[in-house]
A protein has these predicted regions:
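Extracellular interdomain linkers/hinges and stalk-like, low-complexity segments
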Residues: 1-28, 97-153, 215-221
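Short helix-loop boundary/capping segments
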Residues: 9, 28-66
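Extracellular Ig-like/FN3 beta-sandwich strand-entry sites
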Residues: 16, 81-85, 142, 184-186, ...
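Solvent-exposed loop segments of extracellular immunoglobulin-like
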Residues: 17, 25-39, 153-164
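Residue-level signature of extracellular beta-strand-rich folds
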Residues: 21, 88, 147-149, 159-161, ...
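Surface-exposed binding patches on compact interaction domains or structured appendages
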Residues: 39-43, 48-52, 155-179
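Strand-loop-strand motifs at the edges of beta-sheets in extracellular beta-sandwich domains
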Residues: 54-78, 170-194, 206
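A short beta-strand micro-motif common to beta-rich folds, especially ectodomain repeats
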Residues: 83-94, 199-212
Length: 221
């Protein structure tokens, strides 16, 4: 497997925040995400050794630094300013047997808080899969999912979308457009899936919103 989404460095203090590195396996093997211990350099050991005494970055009261094992979404409400290191581990399973894993050591820099871009709750998705919004598409029929994002502090929101549907021979497309509200933008996911894309497990898509200072990732199926 490999990661589809580039790392995020900056995030706001005392603000609920999400990031998804989105590991992907082209062979279709099962993936499980977890938080690991960052490694330090070690002579003669190319992978390094776990940092002794490492603890997860500090979180606001009643919250934890956590990762969803199914989607890979990292959730954190940082409680203090500073630089923090963490590790995402993605294990690969085939027929219930672990056959490999990848790690990504990353750094977060927590800065004073300003408003972050938010994805408005989609009113055209009524289903969910393990608590994540689930949109249904039918093979042979055009599929369009319109979403809206808002940021009260800026009039320019940039958006990107990542996921397996964009890597297929018959790829999904992603468009961003204006609305009547200068602080609000429209996002459209469009696809014409064929019978070849039909499968039991849903496709995971990550939408990233950026306001020039911070970004927020949102996962949906």
């Amino acid at each position: 497997p490999f990661f589809l989404v580039k790392p995020v460095v900056f995030l706001p203090v005392n603000t609920p925040w999400q990031y998804n590195p989105l590991p992907y396996d082209p062979d279709g093997d099962s993936l499980s995400w977890s938080l690991g211990i960052p490694h330090d350099e070690s002579t003669g050991n190319p992978t390094g050794i776990p940092i002794a005494g490492y603890t997860n970055p500090p979180s606001a009261s009643g919250t934890t630094f956590s990762i969803d094992p199914l989607t890979g979404t990292i959730s954190w409400t940082a409680s203090v300013l500073g630089n923090f290191v963490y590790t995402v581990t993605c294990e690969e399973f085939r027929n219930g047997v672990k056959i490999g894993e990848i790690r990504r050591d990353m750094q977060f820099i927590v800065l004073p808080s300003v408003p972050t871009p938010q994805l408005l709750p989609p009113n055209n998705i009524s289903s969910s899969y393990n608590g994540v919004p689930l949109a249904l598409a039918v093979a042979g029929y055009p599929f369009t999912l319109n979403l809206f994002a808002m940021d009260s502090s800026v009039t320019t929101i940039l958006a990107e979308a990542f996921g397996e549907p964009f890597l297929l021979n018959n790829p999904m497309t992603f468009l961003q457009g204006n609305t009547d509200d200068p602080f609000k933008t429209k996002l459209s996911l469009m696809w014409l899936p064929s019978i070849n894309e039909v499968r039991e497990n849903p496709y995971l898509v990550v939408v990233r919103l950026m306001n020039g200072t911070f970004s927020m990732d949102y996962s949906l199926y």
